[in-house]
Swiss-Prot record:
GO annotation terms (biological process): response to hydroperoxide
Superkingdom of the organism of origin: Bacteria
Protein name listed in UniProt: UPF0246 protein swp_3736
Assigned GO CC terms: cytosol
NCBIfam families the record matches: PRK02101.1-1, PRK02101.1-3
Family assignment from sequence similarity: Belongs to the UPF0246 family.
Pfam families: H2O2_YaaD (PF03883)
HAMAP family: UPF0246
Coiled-coil ranges (or none): none
InterPro entries: YaaA
Amino acid sequence: MLILVSPAKTLDFENPAATQSYSIPTLLGQSEQLIDVCRKLTPSDIASLMKVSDKIAGLNVARFSSWDSDFTPDNAKQAVFAFRGDVYTGLDADTLSEASLQKAQQQLRILSGLYGLLKPLDLMQAYRLEMGTRLSNARGTNLYQFWGDIITDEINQTTAAQGDEFIINLASNEYFKAVKHKQLTANLVTPVFKDKKNGQYKVISFFAKKARGMMVRYILDNNVESLDALIKFDSAGYYYSEAESTVTAPVFLREEQ
């Protein structure tokens, strides 16, 4: 199975990665085209476009300016160790064994506004370019139009080469919209995580993001290769609810924390 996750806004380029192994992003040529567009933006353009403070806008101008596609471990970092959001807290990649990291390299893909699709050990340089950004480019007025079929084709090529029967979608709606799901050749499964609050089970963003990362970790640690094995996910008190689930959307519940 192939797993899809979102990137994170929070980045860590200070601490060293937990491995020296690395790879280079497949779609780097596309990234260069986007960088060329972004380098023409002023700090005020970026503040308006990305709805960020002047300070963050200035930081991103500097990042776009210094971005260099000749990635090395000295000027870039492996994606799974560079991202530091709720999903990545749940995954806790720093404690993965080398064997699990290599398994992740095969099974896990990170959707990205700038890089399109990243393998965990792909080197990347710091950036902020969310998939929902309305960035005018040569192919349209936003990043969904820029990426078009490119990400979907890359996913299909990967699942075909690896013989993956399932795609486990653990990405946010914003990022998964970059995938043309009707064109996917493997079976799509989108797990749902609900926490009990005030007597009702509901999707709570913070908990759901962390649960997505924990499910990635569970798949890697337990060599999960089937849906029967996937629904045994029980990290942090979650349990499978057959009553609420469908084949394509297994639901996992957790009592009030």
